[in-house]
Structure formats: structure tokens, C-alpha cells
């Protein structure tokens, strides 16, 4: 499709997590978090590499102990994606992973210790050019805020976040991003809206503890979709009680749906009815699995009959319109060929791969011309 999302991004400052730019108009980064034991180096490395393969820009790793910090050192040496260390309570762990090359520290200054310990962590981060993420969560609000507000509210999450921001401001440290997560969609959305008006730093979006693969994806799509459509958000994580790989896939699907950032194929497919001339559902499911390695952005419409098929094909990179025994194949809105319905999956996979190669080559040539 050629339509552009009419979304004006919120202006924010720029930080870098490793080599990934965050904020100030940079592409919205998609991240996940490992759910292995960090001390199990092999399992953690394997999971991070699986996340890399599906396009993760950043991966967060929990580092709850010094043993985990030593494991983090080995993990960092074996992966390419930037790593965020998730640390609570023990400032010494933050200092240790900073020594081992961490790309970002996820901490709350308020639970890392007294002012001197906070200063030590911030000074270390400044010296090593390591950004910090302040992570506020409705499930772990400070006791006095729970008593003040009675329950998690947008104002409570905002007040908690601003306390931590003030900690860093007093230390003249501005290389940070902030999140204010909640499992309730409306609580999270309103909290982010309030925070976006208060600070200029990048915001990391998430609906925390969203649920299983299906319900969590729905909650995240609604909550993150609302914020992203308003231009709020610089990084995101879809939190699912599922394989972390699914978090990355859903994250990119949300961005693709809003036309904010595209990676891989955007399949447009009908829900099918008795008019379908070939197995649309089986075709789409098979192609989604077979073509996971394709990162070239393109729209592929797979429609089972001639009612909506031609119209969708006109605005797709490639489109199939169901027909009797053979279906029409469109490329860039022009009908090019007919595909045998009994061999649809193999034929369409070959055409999509060929088109992806063609688009990649065209982009490579464009880049070379710009660089000359």
C-alpha cells in the first residue's frame, strides 16, 4: 500500500543503547527480555540469538545476583544485539555489569540505595557512556504513594517516575529513558500521556504482565496502538507469558499496522467464505512460516475470490485473487500471471522471494547513488 500514517512523533532527546538510536525521530526500537536463568549462559545466549534472528533491536536480561553478573560477562561476549541489564536493590551489580560492557542499565534510583550509591552508579554510567532506563511499574509503587493514592493511578505512576527523574536531574545526568507500565490498559495509557507532557526524554512503552500469547497481544495492540497513534513512544516491548520471540513478532506487527515501521511481509488476507477458490487460510499460515527470514518490507494480499481481490491487489506489492482452478497474480497493481490453485503455496513463495530480491537490489543501487 502507498498510504502513509498521519502520525506526528513526539519530540524527544536522543540517546543510544549500544549502536541503536533512541528518540529524536529514530525508528521505534522493538525489544524483548530473556526468561532463562541468566546463570545458564548457553540457554540465555541461544534465546538472545533467536531474538536477534526475528529482528530484536535490544534485549533485556535480568541480573539479580553477582553470579548472574559474571554470567552476563560471558553472554555479552557471544551476542551482537545491545543488552540491557535489569537490576534492583544492589548497586554493586550495576557497577559490575558496567565494567563488563552493558549497553543500558534498567534501574530505579529509589531502590538502588542511598544518595551516595546512586551517585556511584550514575557517575559510572556517565564515565562509560551508558544510558539508564527508569522503570516504574504499577505493581511495585513506593509504599507512601500507595498510601497517598489508595491504589495505582496515573498520577501515582507519574509522581513515582518524576521522583526518579529528579534523582538523575540532581546529578546532571540526562542520558535516560522512562517507562510507566501497568497491566491495565487505560492506567498505562493515561500514565504515559501525563509523563509525555512532563519530560523530553525518550519513553519506553509497555503494557506489563499483559497475559498469554493471544490476550496479551490484544491488550498490547490496544494500549501501545493508542499511544503510538498519538506519537508517543520511542521503544516498546510486548510483554507476553509466551516465547519471547513472539513478543518481537507482535511488536513489529503493531508497528506495521500503524505504518510506523515495516519489517518483513505484511500479509493482507480475507477471513474466507464459500466463495474462496483456494485454501486461503492454509496458504497464509504456510507462507508466514516459510517466509520468516524475509525482512524486506512489502504488502502481499491473498484474497480467495474476485469480490475484493482485485482492489486489494491494486495497492499491494504482490496480490493473489482467487479464480476457478487458477488465480490471478498481480505485481505492483498490474496483473502479471495466473497461478495453479493446487500449487499455490510453492508458486507464491517463489514469486515473493524473487520480488524481495528485486526490491533489495533496487534499494542497494539507490544507496550507492546517494553515497556517490
UniProtKB/Swiss-Prot annotation:
It comes from Shigella dysenteriae serotype 1 (strain Sd197). Converts 2C-methyl-D-erythritol 2,4-cyclodiphosphate (ME-2,4cPP) into 1-hydroxy-2-methyl-2-(E)-butenyl 4-diphosphate. It comes from the Bacteria. The gene is ispG. This is 4-hydroxy-3-methylbut-2-en-1-yl diphosphate synthase (flavodoxin). InterPro entries: Dihydropteroate_synth-like_sf, IspG_bac, IspG_bac-typ, NO2/SO3_Rdtase_4Fe4S_sf. Its EC number is 1.17.7.3. One of its GO terms (biological process) is isopentenyl diphosphate biosynthetic process, methylerythritol 4-phosphate pathway. Pathway: Isoprenoid biosynthesis; isopentenyl diphosphate biosynthesis via DXP pathway; isopentenyl diphosphate from 1-deoxy-D-xylulose 5-phosphate: step 5/6. It catalyses: (2E)-4-hydroxy-3-methylbut-2-enyl diphosphate + oxidized [flavodoxin] + H2O + 2 H(+) = 2-C-methyl-D-erythritol 2,4-cyclic diphosphate + reduced [flavodoxin]. It is an enzyme of class 1 (oxidoreductase). HAMAP family: IspG. Keywords: 4Fe-4S, Iron, Iron-sulfur, Isoprene biosynthesis, Metal-binding, Oxidoreductase. The lineage of its organism: Bacteria, Pseudomonadati, Pseudomonadota, Gammaproteobacteria, Enterobacterales. Pfam families: GcpE. One of its GO terms (molecular function) is iron ion binding. Its cofactor is [4Fe-4S] cluster. Belongs to the IspG family. Binds 1 [4Fe-4S] cluster.
